[in-house]
Amino acid sequence: MQINELIKYMESLGLDIHTTTKARGHQGFFLDGRIDISNSLPEERLIPTLLHEFAHYIHSKIEKNINKTGGSLKIIFDTEKNLTSELFAVTNFVDYHSKCEKLIRHREMVKDSIKKLDLQIKEEFPNFQRSKKFKEFDRAIRGTKLKYLLKYDRVRIMPWFMFGKEEVLSINTIEKDFPNLKIAFVNYIRLKSLSRKQRRISNRISKLHRYYNRPTELFARLVEGLYLDKELTCKLAPNATKRFFELLEKGYYGELKFIFDNYVTIC
């Protein structure tokens, strides 16, 4: 399939296609009759991405406000069956980032580091519990500026007076800045920092899972998967692909039928 041929057909439907933009930092996006494909995409990603965004266009004609609502599988597949797990398997094939493997590994490394620090603190304070106040630590830092490092990894403390000196505190220089501070307390500050990092990573994973599980994204990646590898996609999602082709033949997906009739062989 030639990309120019596909663009020409889509433009004949009234779509505004752009392939020389940054696509808002994404591979592509669809909004209000316009499709943008990133100018930094490698050639082999152009057609799959264009089909992905065209699938959003088709979905938007069937179901309104998908950009806000994320759509509904019941509507786009016109069924009460739960097809989510099949569709997500296709998503994992189409976009390896959807597995969040790198983030999950990073989170596990952070969790291991937290456990090690926890054990080191307990060597000196056996009753230490992360979920409870560390009273010995609170007493030790009373009247110091170390409290800021319980919330931030690096802080700039501005002077009260115009000619005072700015002070910078960092978890990387605790031993140097506070040479008399017990190692257990240094470890506690670093443990709190790692706990914040763990939460950030978990939030990132949750955000990605919400994005990849949006019905409109699951549908678009099914279309993308059928172009990339029809046989594998049908194997990963037998019920979803069967329903997709039933509706495609009935004209439920409108102009998407022309794309499949001319460029994608039904499996």
Give, region by region, the residue ranges found by the protein language model.
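Zn2+-dependent metallopeptidase catalytic core
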Residues: 1-14
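Hydrophobic (often cysteine-bearing) scaffold residues that line and stabilize catalytic clefts
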Residues: 2, 47, 212, 216
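Generic structural signal for residues in well-ordered beta-strands
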Residues: 15-20
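Short, exposed beta-strand/loop patches in secreted or surface proteins that constitute
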Residues: 25-30
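Short pre-active-site segment immediately N-terminal to the catalytic Zn-binding motif
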Residues: 31-51
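Post-HEXXH active-site segment of zinc metalloproteases
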Residues: 44, 60-105, 237-241
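Active-site recognition of the HExxH zinc-binding catalytic motif
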Residues: 48-61, 220
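Pan-zinc metallopeptidase signature
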Residues: 101-267
